[in-house]
Amino acid sequence: MGTATFSEAVLKNLIQHDYNIVQVVSQPDRRVGRKKELKMPEVKVVALEHDIPVFQPQRIKDDYQAIIDMQPDLIITAAYGQMIPQEVLDCPRLGCINVHASLLPKYRGGAPVHYAILNGDEKTGVTIMYMVKKMDAGNIIYQKETPISNDETVGELYDRLSILGAEAIIEAMPAIIEGTNESIPQDESKVTYSPVISREQEKIDFNKPAVEVYNHVRGLNPWPGAYTTYQGKTVKIYQGLVHNCP
C-alpha cells in the first residue's frame, strides 16, 4: 500500500526479490499541472508493468473490502497517505508493517524528511514497524541509519531514504515471515511529530539565524518550496549559502 516515489522503490525491490504481490493499493489518480492532466501514482505504474492488480479507494476507511477479500498474509505500507482502518490492520495473519522515513519515535507523521533538514539533524534513517491504530506508534522491527550532509535538500534526502527503505524491508522480511523477528515498543518519552508543512511554515523568517534560514530553504527544496515576498510579489527561494562574516 502506497502512493509516492517512496513506495515505488519498496515495491520494485519486493518484486525483484520474487515476493508474491497479490495486490497494490494506492491513492486515486490525480489531475496535476496547469493542463490538469490525469496522472497515475508511481506505485500504480510499476504494478501495471508487472500485471499486479491495483485497488484505488477514494477513502479507504469507507472502502476496504477488496483488501480483505484478497486474504493477504502480510500488508506492507509506505507513504500511503491515509489512516488504515482497524479491519484492515486485523486482516493479514503476519500483520501490517510500515516503512517510515525516520528513526522512530522521532518524527511521527507525514513530513519526517522535511523536519530532519529543517531542524538541522545530522542523521536520520528508516524504520520498519508494526502498524497499530495510532499513527506511527507500533513496535519497531528494524531500523537503518544514514548521515545527512549539511548541503542536502529534502528532495535529495527523500530519494536516498527511498532506496534505504527498499533495502531495509528486504533485510527485515525473512524474520517477519518466519516469525523470528523481535520487535520493541517505542519510547513514548522520546516521541516527536512531523505534521504536514503548512503554507505559513513555508515563508522564510529572515530574523532567524543564518543557519536556520539556510536549513529552511534546503528543507523545503524542491517541495513545497520556501518563499518570501518582494515588492508585493511572492518569490520562491531554492538555494542559499551561509557566509562567515568577519
Protein language model annotation of sequence segments:
Residues 1-224:
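One-carbon transfer enzymes
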